[in-house]
Design a protein with these regions (language model features):
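Non-catalytic connector elements of ABC transporters
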Residues: 161, 170-282
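Short, small-residue-biased leader/transition segments that mark boundaries at the very start
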Residues: 1-2
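ABC ATPase nucleotide-binding domains
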Residues: 5-156
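Short linear sequence elements within intrinsically disordered, low-complexity coil regions
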Residues: 10-16, 27, 151, 162, ...
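Short beta-strand-centered aromatic/proline hotspots
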Residues: 166
Length: 282
C-alpha cells in the first residue's frame, strides 16, 4: 500500500522526471524499465513537456499530478490519498477531480481517499463510507447514500436535509401515511412499521417545489412564509417558516429567468412528491 498525504512533498532539488523516478531508483529497478515506466506515467498525467521543470515552476494542479505519478509509478495494489486536493482553489479542484479519477481508473489501482469535502467524495468515489465514532454507518454508491440514507445521522451528515418528525398512522404495501403537526406525509411505499411508531421524514431541499397558489393536495404540502433567500446563480435557496414554526429549506433551480418572482416575507406553498421522502427510525 502507498499513502499520499495532503502535502505533495515534492523534492525541490529534483525536476519532475527525477521526482517521479525517485521511488524506482530506491527500489533498484533496472534503468531501461525505470525510464519506460516514468515516461509512461508522465504521458498518463500529461506532463511530458514539463519533465525537466522544477516543482516551483509548476501550478498547484501540476504539482498534484506529479505527486500522484510518483505514487502510481511504483504500481501499488492499494493507494491511500489524504485530502489530495485540499491545497487547490475551488475551480482547479473541480477540474482536477475528474482528471484524478480518470488516471486512477486507467492504472487500475484501488484507491481509498479520505476527505471532508462532500462534493469531492460524491464526484470521485465509486463507493462512499460514512463513519461516526469509529464505526461505519453506511457504505454504498454516492447516489445510494444521498438518496437513501439508512439513519438520521447519515441523512443529516451527507448534504442538506429537512428532518421532520411524525407518527406512522397508515402502512400498506404500496403507501404509508405519517401524521405530524406540519402536515400529512404520503409516502409512495410501505415501511413495515407498527402504527403509532414515531418516525423521522428526511426531505432534501431540492425535492421541494414552491408555488404562490394552493397546490390543491391534502398531503405533502404546507403553507409557509419566506424568511430569507440566497441567490447562487444556478439555484436559489429559500429558508421558509411554516405556520407551526417549523423551518424548511428549499432549493429552486433557476432554469427560467422569468419564473415566479418570490420575495422575502411572501406567503406561499411548499409541496413535494410522494417519492421525495425517506422515512427513518427516530
Amino acid at each position: 500500500m502507498l499513502f499520499r498525504s495532503q502535502s505533495y512533498a515534492l523534492f525541490p532539488h529534483l525536476n519532475v522526471w527525477d521526482n517521479v523516478a525517485f521511488g524506482l531508483k530506491r527500489d533498484g529497478v533496472p534503468k531501461a524499465e525505470m525510464v519506460e515506466r516514468v515516461e509512461d506515467m508522465l504521458a498518463l498525467v500529461q506532463l511530458q513537456k514539463f519533465a525537466k521543470r522544477s516543482p516551483h515552476q509548476l501550478s498547484g494542479g501540476q504539482q498534484q499530478r506529479v505527486a500522484l505519478a510518483r505514487s502510481l509509478v511504483k504500481r501499488p495494489q492499494l493507494l491511500m490519498l489524504d485530502e489530495p486536493l485540499g491545497a487547490l482553489d475551488k475551480k482547479l479542484r473541480e477540474e482536477t477531480q475528474v482528471e484524478l479519477v480518470n488516471i486512477i481508473k486507467q492504472v487500475g489501482v484501488t484507491c481509498v481517499m479520505v476527505t471532508h469535502d462532500q462534493d469531492e467524495a460524491m464526484t470521485m468515489a465509486d463507493r462512499i463510507a460514512v463513519m461516526s465514532e469509529g464505526r461505519f454507518l453506511q457504505v454504498g454508491a454516492p447516489s445510494e447514500v444521498y438518496e437513501y440514507p439508512n439513519c438520521r445521522f447519515v441523512a443529516d451528515f451527507v448534504g442538506n436535509v429537512n428532518l421532520l418528525d411524525g407518527e406512522l398512522t397508515e402502512d400498506e404495501p404500496d403507501h404509508a401515511v405519517i401524521t405530524s403537526p406540519l402536515c400529512r406525509f404520503h409516502v409512495g411505499h410501505g415501511i413495515s412499521g407498527h402504527l403509532g411508531m414515531p418516525v423521522t421524514v428526511a426531505l432534501r431541499p431540492e425535492k421541494i417545489s414552491l408555488s404562490l397558489q394552493d397546490p390543491g393536495q391534502s398531503h405533502n404540502a404546507v403553507a409557509c412564509r419566506v424568511e430569507s433567500l440566497s441567490y447562487f446563480g444556478s439555484y436559489t435557496s429559500y429558508h421558509l417558516k411554516t405556520l407551526h414554526g417549523q423551518t424548511l429549506q428549499a432549493w429552486v433551480t433557476n432554469t427560467d429567468r422569468h419564473h415566479e418572482h418570490i420575495e422575502m416575507g411572501q406567503s406561499l406553498w411548499a409541496h413535494w412528491q410522494s417519492n421525495a421522502m425517506v422515512v427513518l427510525d427516530r
